[in-house]
Design a protein with these regions (language model features):
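Short hydrophobic beta-strand segments that form the core of ligand-binding sensory/regulatory domains
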Residues: 142, 166-170
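Short, hydrophobic/aromatic-rich segments at coil-to-beta transitions
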Residues: 35-41, 135-144
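A short, structured loop/turn motif at beta-sheet edges
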Residues: 131-136, 157-163
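Short, charged interaction patches at domain edges and termini
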Residues: 147-154
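N-terminal targeting sequences that direct proteins away from the cytosol to non-cytosolic compartments
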Residues: 17-88, 105-107, 111-113, 117-118, ...
Length: 201
């Protein structure tokens, strides 16, 4: 009887040591995102430009820009539009200004640069890409902002003489680069389609 009582704890000890439980930390998981099917339509409004944009996006006039209220220059721009992505919780803010002098043109270009590099605090890198479509007189710069910055994509388009349009993509959530990366890659393709199809009227 004493022998059985001795062997029971020993067997339990071996059983406890032999378990195959993995207690290593697991990477954080994120919700699965169901992306809408890619389909596009023409944007034609009472504006001096036109472009192609996704059917799952909503274009609206931005009469009280929430993200840009602090920037008085933006509020004074001729047109403020939002390309809303309701399913993806993001907005591409578009602002247009007519170029009336070289001084205004230089200021607009400098502002675009400053607004992009304002994100340097949280960004791990900022890349600039040249936009050039001479047949349509569409030129500009495309800023890719990596890391946990509030805006991951910014750009401006101009014909250098009469027109200037700036775009900035924001998501309505705390920026976590890993979690928004799939959505960002999806929306970036739409921004590329918009830029490649962009025309001045």
């Amino acid at each position: 009887m004493k022998r059985i009582i001795f062997f029971i704890p020993v067997l339990l000890l071996f059983a406890a040591c032999n378990s195959n439980h993995d207690y290593s930390p697991k990477p954080r998981g994120y919700f699965r995102i169901v992306f809408p099917e890619k389909a596009y339509q023409q944007f034609n409004g009472p504006y001096p430009f036109t472009f192609i944009y996704p059917k799952y996006a909503v274009m609206e006039k931005d009469s009280a820009p929430s993200l840009q209220k602090k920037d008085k220059k933006l509020l004074n721009m001729k047109y403020l539009l939002n390309m809303q992505f309701p399913q993806l919780n993001g907005t591409l803010h578009l602002s247009y200004e007519a170029i009336t002098s070289k001084k205004i043109f230089d200021e607009l270009i400098e502002d675009a640069h400053k607004l992009a590099f304002k994100h340097t605090v949280k960004a791990t890198g900022i890349d600039e890409g040249i936009i050039s479509y001479p047949d349509r007189k569409v030129y500009g710069l495309y800023y890719t902002i990596d890391g946990n910055a509030a805006s991951a994509v910014q750009f401006y388009l101009t014909d250098s003489l009469h027109h200037y349009l700036r775009g900035a993509l924001y998501f309505n959530s705390i920026p976590q680069f890993d979690s928004i990366q799939p959505v960002l890659n999806f929306v970036k393709k739409d921004v590329d389609v918009m830029i490649k199809s962009f025309k001045w009227k």
